[in-house]
Amino acid sequence: MTHQTHAYHMVNPSPWPLTGALSALLMTSGLIMWFHFNSTTLLMLGLTTNMLTMYQWWRDIIRESTFQGHHTPSVQKGLRYGMILFIISEVLFFTGFFWAFYHSSLAPTPELGGCWPPTGIHPLNPLEVPLLNTSVLLASGVSITWAHHSLMEGNRNHMLQALFITIALGVYFTLLQASEYYEAPFTISDGVYGSTFFVATGFHGLHVIIGSTFLIVCFFRQLKFHFTSNHHFGFEAAAWYWHFVDVVWLFLYVSIYWWGS
């Protein structure tokens, strides 16, 4: 920064976008291999490459922001705009799944028996595990807000406690979702109901895992005193993302579990 006449961060060449793209290719190809040929080798390779990329990319960004001072107010403003645009793109991503669901359910075709849920499908009870999942995510939304307020007030211990509670609730949600999938009386191959249900709730579950990972990184960074009350965009971005995941779940619960059943 000492040799620059501007406040912007000129990023050094990095291999991580390339390895990240490679891991995405390996994971999507691996999913196809798993679905059609029952082989998980390519999927595991993709997941390993993805984990290594995440670790090293996060390490570089933490070095640049916390230790080298590259994240000036101007850079943070750009990162905020970037995160907002990313969340908007995610909203549009999930809109596609809701569109598919309502397109199929509002005017069910004769092939589905002219009714929704389709003939032969026994939907999950929305007042059992899905309602528990809803309360778990709403509670995690409260605890992440508590963590944010504690950080703003400089209360490190409360911030760590609240962040730990949020992570625990996120992991609990994932375990509940996995058990629900395991016990579901229908599969992803059971027509349009199975495919829209598992793709929409599955991608949301993936986002919960990503959000939990993001919060775990923030937890370890807070243990190392990386965040201050006026310089903590990494945590702020994780909190925004978590609230987004919360809101998407409410729409999923009302649409697919409650109305759709």
UniProtKB/Swiss-Prot annotation:
A molecular function (GO) term: cytochrome-c oxidase activity
Keywords assigned: Membrane, Mitochondrion, Mitochondrion inner membrane, Translocase, Transmembrane, Transmembrane helix
Keyword Mitochondrion appears in the UniProt entry: yes
Pfam families associated with the record: COX3
Stored Gene3D superfamilies: 1.10.287.70, Cytochrome c oxidase, subunit III, four-helix bundle (1.20.120.80)
Localization: Mitochondrion inner membrane
Catalytic activity: 4 Fe(II)-[cytochrome c] + O2 + 8 H(+)(in) = 4 Fe(III)-[cytochrome c] + 2 H2O + 4 H(+)(out)
Membrane topology: Multi-pass membrane protein
GO biological process: mitochondrial electron transport, cytochrome c to oxygen; respiratory chain complex IV assembly
Topology Mitochondrial matrix: residue spans: 1-15, 67-72, 153-155, 224-232
EC number assigned by the record: 7.1.1.9
GO cellular component: mitochondrial inner membrane; respiratory chain complex IV
Residues annotated as transmembrane: 16-34, 41-66, 73-105, 129-152, 156-183, 191-223, 233-256
Mitochondrial intermembrane side: 35-40, 106-128, 184-190, 257-261
Superkingdom of origin: Eukaryota
Purpose of the protein: Component of the cytochrome c oxidase, the last enzyme in the mitochondrial electron transport chain which drives oxidative phosphorylation. The respiratory chain contains 3 multisubunit complexes succinate dehydrogenase (complex II, CII), ubiquinol-cytochrome c oxidoreductase (cytochrome b-c1 complex, complex III, CIII) and cytochrome c oxidase (complex IV, CIV), that cooperate to transfer electrons derived from NADH and succinate to molecular oxygen, creating an electrochemical gradient over the inner membrane that drives transmembrane transport and the ATP synthase.
Family: Belongs to the cytochrome c oxidase subunit 3 family.
Subunit structure: Component of the cytochrome c oxidase (complex IV, CIV), a multisubunit enzyme composed of 14 subunits. The complex is composed of a catalytic core of 3 subunits MT-CO1, MT-CO2 and MT-CO3, encoded in the mitochondrial DNA, and 11 supernumerary subunits COX4I, COX5A, COX5B, COX6A, COX6B, COX6C, COX7A, COX7B, COX7C, COX8 and NDUFA4, which are encoded in the nuclear genome.
PANTHER family: CYTOCHROME C OXIDASE SUBUNIT 3 (PTHR11403:SF7), CYTOCHROME C OXIDASE SUBUNIT III (PTHR11403)
Protein name: Cytochrome c oxidase subunit 3
